[in-house]
């Protein structure tokens, strides 16, 4: 931020300063969530795809299971957790209809829990994207009001009498847009990525159950 922008912020009216502070905090929060969610979903997607690819290439389920059992259960990603849980549930059993149905219910519980974990704070991105423009608009309105108040206190129309209020209005609009624009883009991309991850994990679970039942 250059000196002029900082000076403008310091000279702005208190309501506009509060609005700008809220928008700046919202923008920082948005970017922190974007980076955190990007790395979380990328890690989960890559790990799940890796185990799905190994299964699809014909690697023995038992070998995949033993490799995953060496990891901490809390470190497993959706498809990895599904493989371990399905194997524990069905392997070395008679694979009756009741056991298969019980395993399918277990898979749904795991998927729902993982979806909830991976979607954490996504709603906050949606909230920022929808509210930031209106907060910025409020700052715009206050800035325009201040500009008109500047007119009312002078007998002659001059740029210096309206410039502070107009500047406040424009800055509030710009900061509101800067806070709002990245959030919906990231939210839509992350939601799509999460849906693909969950659907892929469910499809993997079905193939896994079928394969184990053949043994």
Show which residues each predicted segment covers:
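Hydrophobic membrane-targeting segments
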Residues: 1-53
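Residue-level signal for the membrane-embedded core of alpha-helical transmembrane segments
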Residues: 19-29, 132-135, 139-142, 177
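Physicochemical signature of membrane-embedded alpha-helices that form the seven-helix bundle of GPCRs
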Residues: 22, 125-128, 163
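Alpha-helical transmembrane segments of multi-pass membrane proteins
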Residues: 23-26, 184, 188
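Predominantly long cytosolic amphipathic alpha-helical stalk/bundle segments
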Residues: 46-158, 185-215
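Hydrophobic alpha-helical transmembrane segments of polytopic membrane proteins
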Residues: 169-185
